[in-house]
């Protein structure tokens, strides 16, 4: 089993229609037809959305995405219209809410990898390829790749795994021109972010983006980057000072949560069909601190 341990009820706000409850974000539509995206403090691990929230996590993700959108503005436009709180919205939505353009979304997770780890490592160990891209012998967990690669995946529902697919599969799905634009833009954004992060002592190992098309009045379309960008939820950030290929790398993400859930202390058997337990306060505090540290190191600004 997988999914929500306790699925939250959507907040009812006058003038907003609830569309979707995701792992982290709740999506609404306002009366103007724009999307209202609210980043919650929910956290997921091992395909479960956990019953315990991480305070301020949604605000960290939102503020960090906005910072990255500014760094990327000359490469690709983004979907943000406003950060104003909708009338009648709860006060807790402040700092975690974006009013966004309604786009024709491309149903592809656009993943860029500069280092070998995660599902890419599993595939490489079996085939010496990742998403059909041949890689040299001798790579290990954490190895830097000869150059960044585009490794798309199909988007999965809550509780399911995204599935890695080849570029050729994506080209058949969305058309060769769109596939080429997705690959080019994904790798351009990755390279920009990689270089910015490197200057702050951070390795951007891999990351995933979502894109959609905005239609102009004359019927032409342009590619827009959407959802979140370059956050600890969508990316693997490693401290460069401790990078050592051949082992799992320390990271700025929810590793505290994963480690505790798979430890004897949790009492949870991942192989069972039972949902995971609530997180203890010390794991919540350590995870919150790690998200805030990622924000502060990447942006060079204090969270408070």
From Swiss-Prot:
Recorded GO CC terms: cytoplasm
Keyword tRNA-binding: no
Alphabetical list of Pfam families matching this protein: SAICAR_synt
Entry annotated with the keyword Nucleotide-binding: yes
SUPFAM superfamilies linked to this entry: SAICAR synthase-like
A biological process term (GO) from this entry: 'de novo' IMP biosynthetic process
S-S bridge residues: none
Reactions the enzyme catalyzes: 5-amino-1-(5-phospho-D-ribosyl)imidazole-4-carboxylate + L-aspartate + ATP = (2S)-2-[5-amino-1-(5-phospho-beta-D-ribosyl)imidazole-4-carboxamido]succinate + ADP + phosphate + 2 H(+)
Keywords, sorted A to Z: ATP-binding, Ligase, Nucleotide-binding, Purine biosynthesis
Enzyme class at the top of the EC tree: ligase
Molecular function GO labels: ATP binding; phosphoribosylaminoimidazolesuccinocarboxamide synthase activity
PROSITE patterns xrefs: SAICAR_SYNTHETASE_2
EC numbers on record: 6.3.2.6
Pathway(s) of this molecule: Purine metabolism; IMP biosynthesis via de novo pathway; 5-amino-1-(5-phospho-D-ribosyl)imidazole-4-carboxamide from 5-amino-1-(5-phospho-D-ribosyl)imidazole-4-carboxylate: step 1/2
Family: Belongs to the SAICAR synthetase family.
Protein name per UniProt: Phosphoribosylaminoimidazole-succinocarboxamide synthase
Source taxonomy: Bacteria, Bacillati, Actinomycetota, Actinomycetes, Kitasatosporales
